[in-house]
């Protein structure tokens, strides 16, 4: 059997590696010319995603991932703050949480290594369909084409392959625009370092303004303490933050800015919405080059609406099918689990039923991940309603007082 994979992001590379290990002939075609010259911050891999990965890549690659990953169990519980910097509550203890955060570039580079010379870079797919003999075929912008027994679209949220199968887009804008950046903890004032601690957190204010802070330290909090195996992009305690606003003319104007101009405009926008300066220091201290905008796209959270096509010899996985906003940190993990499931089925079930079973399981998995990710999105959008804004403002002092009282006990 020969499998053609379109897209060498996280899901496509995980699939390529798994098929190669299983002895299946596979070729992964990716439009980027360098897997490291790509955007992205950190990816969270929970226990099931790590378990899936350990079946897809060789043990030495798993070890290098663990040596480059930041362990959640070494972090303090997540915090919820208000826009004045008051603590409203804490999340659960993380000491038994097996999840890790890893730089997207590091994860992608390690997966690319696992795929080896079955990865073909600089190949832009421009069309997909069936040849006269019924074999699936992919066409590229350089005039070449390739056929296989199975074509898998792992080409992300704007997937060409899934659009061919579904007859249209498989997701839509979720109503929120995100702006991310990277801030070294060493660039924060002593006061702010003490206030934030070694924890991730979320601030949600009225009018749909929210700020996520993700703490990672792949060196100090390494999952596996093997410095000789380490290859993270992040080399010290760092906050990867995501500012979120409802999609509007204001965010449209922000999206046109870059670097320090965007960073300053984000701070100004939060200040207009009543946020205290100390809460915004993490944005002000960010590496200007790291600040970038991205739009949240989401597929349906109803399983029956995902992969709305009959099973055949062309399929898709990951964001191509269940594009997931980053609010639950589960999109990449779901793509990896899709890949592991497809590899397993292709090894034990003949082709048409293998794809049918794979797509049925992926619908359930995708819907579960989307349900988790859309909770925070809906909450943030609710604060942009008159009732939601009033409730957010009224609840903050009550929750802050309750948190102080619990702290005193
Ligand atoms: C640049 C980038 C940065 C990201 N940063 C983060 C992040 O910081 N945190 C986070 O949680 N998630 C991030 N994500 C999303 C996360 O990586 C995905 O949600 C998740 O990995 C799902 O994996 P996937 O393989 O389905 O899609 P992706 O990882 O998006 O991979 C899709 C791949 O297909 C390729 N492709 C698309 N169209 C074609 C074509 N026509 N021909 C050939 N190749 C094509 C793309 O170049 C891409 O490499 C990012 C995604 C991208 C593309």
Task: Report residues per predicted region.
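Conserved Rossmann-like nucleotide-cofactor binding loop
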Residues: 11, 34, 158
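C-terminal helical "tail/cap" subdomain of flavin- and related membrane-associated enzymes
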Residues: 1, 62-65, 77-89, 280-285, ...
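Conserved N-terminal glycine-rich FAD pyrophosphate-binding loop of Rossmann-like flavoproteins
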Residues: 33-52
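Glycine-rich FAD pyrophosphate-binding loop
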Residues: 20-39
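Beta1/beta-strand and adjacent pyrophosphate-binding region of the FAD-binding site
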Residues: 1-11
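Conserved FAD/dinucleotide-binding core of flavoprotein oxidoreductases
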Residues: 87-103, 180-288
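FAD-binding beta-loop-beta segment adjacent to the flavin cofactor pocket
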Residues: 294-317, 322
């Amino acid at each position: 059997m020969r499998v053609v994979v379109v897209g060498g992001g996280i899901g496509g590379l995980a699939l390529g590696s798994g098929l190669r290990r299983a002895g299946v002939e596979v070729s992964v075609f990716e439009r980027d010319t360098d897997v490291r010259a790509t955007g992205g911050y950190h990816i969270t891999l929970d226990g099931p995603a790590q378990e899936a990965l350990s079946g897809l890549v060789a043990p030495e690659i798993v070890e290098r991932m663990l040596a480059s990953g930041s362990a959640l169990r070494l972090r303090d519980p997540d915090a919820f703050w208000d826009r004045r910097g008051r603590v409203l509550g804490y999340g659960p203890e993380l000491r038994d949480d097996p999840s890790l955060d890893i730089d997207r570039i590091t994860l992608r580079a390690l997966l690319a290594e696992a795929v080896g010379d079955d990865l073909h870079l600089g190949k832009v797919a421009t069309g997909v369909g069936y040849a006269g003999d019924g074999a699936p075929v992919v066409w590229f912008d350089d005039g070449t084409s390739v056929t296989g027994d199975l074509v898998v679209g792992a080409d992300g949220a704007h997937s060409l392959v899934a659009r061919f199968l579904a007859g249209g887009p498989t997701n839509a804008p979720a109503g929120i625009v995100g702006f991310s950046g990277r801030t070294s903890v060493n660039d924060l004032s002593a006061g702010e370092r003490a206030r934030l601690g070694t924890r991730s957190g979320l601030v949600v204010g009225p009018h749909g303004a929210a700020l996520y802070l993700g703490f990672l330290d792949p060196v100090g909090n390494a999952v596996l303490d093997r410095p000789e195996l380490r290859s993270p992009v992040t080399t010290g305690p760092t906050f990867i933050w995501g500012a979120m606003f409802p999609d509007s003319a204001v965010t449209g104007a922000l999206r046109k800015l870059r670097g320090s101009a965007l960073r300053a405009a984000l701070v100004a926008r939060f200040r207009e919405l009543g946020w205290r300066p100390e809460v915004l220091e993490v944005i002000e201290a960010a590496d200007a080059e790291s600040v970038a905008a991205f739009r949240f796209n989401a597929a349906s959270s109803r399983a029956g609406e995902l992969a709305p096509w009959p099973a055949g010899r062309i399929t898709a996985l990951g964001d191509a099918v269940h594009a997931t906003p980053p609010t639950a940190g589960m999109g990449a993990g779901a793509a990896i689990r899709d890949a592991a499931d497809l590899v397993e089925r292709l090894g034990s079930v003949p082709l048409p039923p293998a794809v049918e079973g794979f797509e049925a399981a992926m619908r359930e998995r995708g819907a579960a991940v989307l349900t988790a990710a859309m909770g925070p999105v809906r909450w943030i959008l609710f604060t942009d309603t008159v009732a939601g804004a009033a409730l957010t403002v009224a609840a903050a002092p009550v929750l802050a007082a309750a948190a102080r009282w619990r702290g005193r006990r």
